[in-house]
């Protein structure tokens, strides 16, 4: 049992708890350098004593914001080996940009042309902002050149076609809810 006690005491300095031991930041930096350098075979394995000193000095020198910036890429590098786990979020990100931004744009303009009761409950400021410029754009374009094809009414007609059924259902639901409450129609 005495051997185990000695091993437990010595493992605190050389084992995995070395990264969390409070004596000095240089031991933590050395443990991190060993952990990273062993798996990747990087440049830190060539001179193990120099990186521990260099690793400790900038960490104590830089403000906490710089430390957090340094820690983030390390986490990405450690997780870089598990790229299979990161593929679904990347596909979600790539699908968000072209597809969902367009659908959100058309949805906002479609909800502006449709039932105001449903759009006012979700967001108050965005329908007012979106309906103001769209209405003024379509009026100025119609007044300036009536023979020219107008992209704004075409887009709004497309949105009305896509969201007409949804807006109609929302209007009916609102109508029925007002009837059940006993309030007169507005």
Curated annotation (Swiss-Prot):
InterPro entries: VCF1/2-like. Residues 108-123 have a biased composition (Low complexity). It comes from the Eukaryota. Residues 31-43 have a biased composition (Basic residues). Residues 136-147 have a biased composition (Polar residues). The keyword Chaperone does not apply. Belongs to the VCF family. This is Protein VCF1. The gene is VCF1.
